[in-house]
């Protein structure tokens, strides 16, 4: 089941923090695109993944946001409570690490969109010959599969496989990554053989995923901190639609983003003020890029060739 988010008051936050405090065994500060995020937990399996996933932060820096991650029999499974004033999130009975790291990124996004004019995009971002491509879509549409398919080409470099931050600079959009390593699926190597052996079988968690250093496969120079975004491909999976690929007008692309919650289920606050902010950011994003809609009901290779055709790349072979 998906997790549920409830907004809480600062007073409720204080009560929950006091309740969790005696159980805290691990306190880790990490840097996520300039934000200091503090993880507090008693789960011995969590710190290793977290520290492999995100860059370390000096312990002398005060945190901008906090994540408490604990089991609690008094709470339902996958319960998230968030105080937007102190930027503190409580995750109770959330065992899937993918949600832990996405909520951490969502917490950073909440801070950055309010205070620095920086937007969050739940999607993959790669650089091909100096031009940035973003792929977004609902869960299961294939953005991760197609991202790693593109990385098989030596001219492709990756910024992020799941989440990036974007900022307007004049006529351009700069896209920034924030993760040290990526949380990948075990079945990736079944689709693209180049990734076979990247992670030992016993290192995958119960969800069939692991935090992996893809530099071992693609090389150290192919993980970039940023790129200039020029193209957005929105992925969908609709077996009833025979059309595979089509360009989108700006209004069509904006409508798809807004109707689908910006393709981001990890936004912690959804209210009229935040919606106005996000509509403006996404409008800026779309207004400075070429947008396409791609139906991914074909084979991974067929979809990969369609993505490459947009970029003027040779077929996937």
Q: Could you describe each region identified by the protein language model?
A:
Residues 145-157:
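A conserved segment at the C-terminal end of the G1
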Residues 1-134, 139, 153-154, 164-317:
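A noncatalytic interaction/capping subdomain that flanks phosphate/NTP-handling catalytic cores
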Residues 161:
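Active-site flanking residues adjacent to catalytic metal/cofactor-binding acidic residues
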Residues 141-143:
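Conserved glycine(s) of the Walker
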